[in-house]
Amino acid sequence: MDSSGASSPDMEPSYGGGLFDMVKGGAGRLFSNLKDNLKDTLKDTSSRVIQSVTSYTKGDLDFTYVTSRIIVMSFPLDSVDIGFRNQVDDIRSFLDSRHLDHYTVYNLSPKSYRTAKFHSRVSECSWPIRQAPSLHNLFAVCRNMYNWLLQNPKNVCVVHCLDGRAASSILVGAMFIFCNLYSTPGPAVRLLYAKRPGIGLSPSHRRYLGYMCDLLADKPYRPHFKPLTIKSITVSPVPFFNKQRNGCRPYCDVLIGETKIYTTCADFERMKEYRVQDGKIFIPLSITVQGDVVVSMYHLRSTIGSRLQAKVTNTQIFQLQFHTGFIPLDTTVLKFTKPELDACDVPEKYPQLFQVTLDVELQPHDKVMELTPPWEHYCTKDVNPSILFSSHQEHQDTLVLGGQAPIDIPPDNPRHFGQGGFFSTLCWQDQKSEKSFCEEDHAALVNQESEQSDDELLTLSSPHGNANGDKPHAARKPSKKQQEPAAPAPPEDVDLLGLEGSAVSKNFSSPAAPPSNSELLSDLFGGGGAAGPVQSGQSGVDDVFHPSGPTSTQSTPRRSATSTSASPTLRVGEGATFDPFGAPSKPSGQDLLGSFLNTASASSDPFLQPTRSPSPTVHASSTPAVNIQPDVSGAWDWHTKPGGFGMGSKSAATSPTGSSHGTPTHQNKPQTLDPFADLGTLGGSSFASKPSTPTGLGGGFPPLSSPQKASPQPMGGGWQQGGGYNWQQTQSKPQSSMPHSSPQNRPNYNVSFSSMPGGQNERGKAAANLEGKQKAADFEDLLSGQGFNAHKDKKGPRTIAEMRKEEMAKEMDPEKLKILEWIEGKERNIRALLSTMHTVLWAGETKWKPVGMADLVTPEQVKKVYRKAVLVVHPDKATGQPYEQYAKMIFMELNDAWSEFENQGQKPLY
């Protein structure tokens, strides 16, 4: 007898002897546990009943179209069962309404039903539940499905297991591989997860999909028939499955298919218990197997009750499954890591670097097989993947959804999808330089519209699909049409790395580039026509911020913005020096960054000279190193245009203040750089400029050396004179400027923006009224003069939730969608649902009065209001009415919320 029970601190000595004390205390704990378990069971059963009735009432079926001709569903039942959504009569009605006399059902579960329900077109496969199917059966079912689809273009296959997850998914994935849609398991699994989430494929399932790929490869692999001897199994480190979490008591089972042929399980006392200190588990087997082999290891447990009943329980540690025909002939050791093992569901029970090792040996002679495998003498080269679809567009969309590029676009390497494995898919027999791309440009080129012919596109070999109805292996093996180019192209010199820096002299036809950021901003502010495309005889700048876009997308790789604008040193024209603080000779004195967005004046811009130089060497050592990034927000010369903001620069003849030569004018560096000097004067003027305003008074920065000034100011250079200009001078006559050091011209940071009409007592109200208007359109005065509105029209959904609602509204019943919007954020919250029920009731309902949250504080109030709501929306009162189904859905939501309210103890609101 264990002494721990007698010495337990919760036992009182007044209860008597040790045995009766233990029985009494144990009985109390037993009934307490029984009460808790019974309560949880009833709660779970009640919730499952409600969910089942809800789903049945709403007409939901567990029914998924993986393709238009492959359907997956869960098990159909003849009777109502808890937790099952598919009733056989509903499924038959649905299939007969859409695919009458053109569907066949494949039952993969060991459970059966009356096949007459589906017009006796049911194939019983009886696959095991927690294992992968045998390779023989998997291949045979795929071949049967293909033959059925081949008979009539309207035929469809309906696949189901118990839950419509793992077994159904491996069959559909194998069917994709069988029809040459995919040549690797990865895209097939991704497509299955996209179409039916939560399929739960185990590593053994994926392994068998790989076997199907080997059987259906260009050079198909044929499994051998040599028996395999498993000498021993080694597990390291020792997993933690006992109560102390320091070891386990393992035994091993070996199965061929579903038949157990060997086990090491013995009497509990005779079995060895392994501890963490042992380091590994070693179990000798010496069993010979052939075909589909399953190796499972269990932990044997024994409790006091099981000892009295002479029973033991077990917990599965892991399971692995493989086919002996795919093991290489010289293999002696098979290693499986934790991601390659099945049934490893509790990660904390497995130490790091957990692995299983099988010591094996292949026999030299083949075993005579009773049945010929279905893959023998079966040619799959004529199998067309288009048989899985009803249209070519569906075929293309499925390839994209599975993570593989469509057949008319060069795909990535399937082994390293999405990681730039592009050059491995090129057909090097066709030496066209137009098909040489940078890896970083591949993703951008795929998304652009291409003007190439089909023959040019076929020069990029695709390992997965076929095009234009050719044979399915035309994509795997290049045909004559792929090897012979449509028209020989002259050899061209391509600078892949951009080391030479010179533009290609030959002009190529390139697809129209989408508008860049600078073009969009240029059109927005009225200066879109300033820049034109770079001619073929000139050296253009391949800048992503340039309005004309890159010069070519096929002949030369696209340079990044960093390589064109952020060079460490800049080459300046001959004899020219660069002063970053001096004013340039352009007509607009403050156009520091506008030259990056205007190509019309690029010939005289010292900033663009280094990017046009074919040599990366520096020719002006006296030039300081400047790092300039193109600014897509616009130039600084927006004040020179009478219409407001302008992106491009004007010529020297349009401004009386600019110089006509290209040499930069040097000026003294200003002593004060105060960009906030005019912040206090923004309240009294509008940003919209007037056409009749004199030069420099258009609501912006005045040009340098403006004729409006009486004399040059010693402290008003470059930035400060334009930045400190008083904006309110646009409303008064021009005045001669005073020296910058005078107190009248200094910036005032204490201005309170009190330019409001009315007296001192009325200003608070006026400010409150104007605040809302300013928030509604803060920049309306800027854009109103240019023909734009400050209010952005909402033409589409702006959030993910709105986009999801928009998609649901296309397919879902409007009444159901309204119910979902009602319960959003209020799931099973009885108070929230009752207080908002008036928003979801049907038209014409006048009995229900809106209830506030203040009337739902106590449980009694909630109960009273809930009963009133039930009387209003009860389905029995809506029998025969057009809103009967709608009332039933409202009633179900209220019923679920009330059940949750009762389960939580009917707590008051506060």
UniProtKB/Swiss-Prot annotation:
Changing residue 876 to A: Loss of interaction with HSPA8. Residues 547-569, 651-666 have a biased composition (Low complexity). One of its GO terms (molecular function) is protein tyrosine phosphatase activity. It is found in: Cytoplasmic vesicle, Clathrin-coated vesicle. May act as a protein phosphatase and/or a lipid phosphatase. Co-chaperone that recruits HSPA8/HSC70 to clathrin-coated vesicles (CCVs) and promotes the ATP-dependent dissociation of clathrin from CCVs and participates in clathrin-mediated endocytosis of synaptic vesicles and their recycling and also in intracellular trafficking. Firstly, binds tightly to the clathrin cages, at a ratio of one DNAJC6 per clathrin triskelion. GO terms for cellular component: clathrin-coated vesicle; intracellular membrane-bounded organelle; postsynaptic density; presynapse; vesicle. Gene3D superfamilies: 2.60.40.1110, DnaJ domain (1.10.287.110), Protein tyrosine phosphatase superfamily (3.90.190.10). The gene is DNAJC6. This is Auxilin. Residues 715-725 have a biased composition (Gly residues). The J domain mediates interaction with HSPA8/HSC70 and is required for basket dissociation. Residues 225-363 form the C2 tensin-type domain.
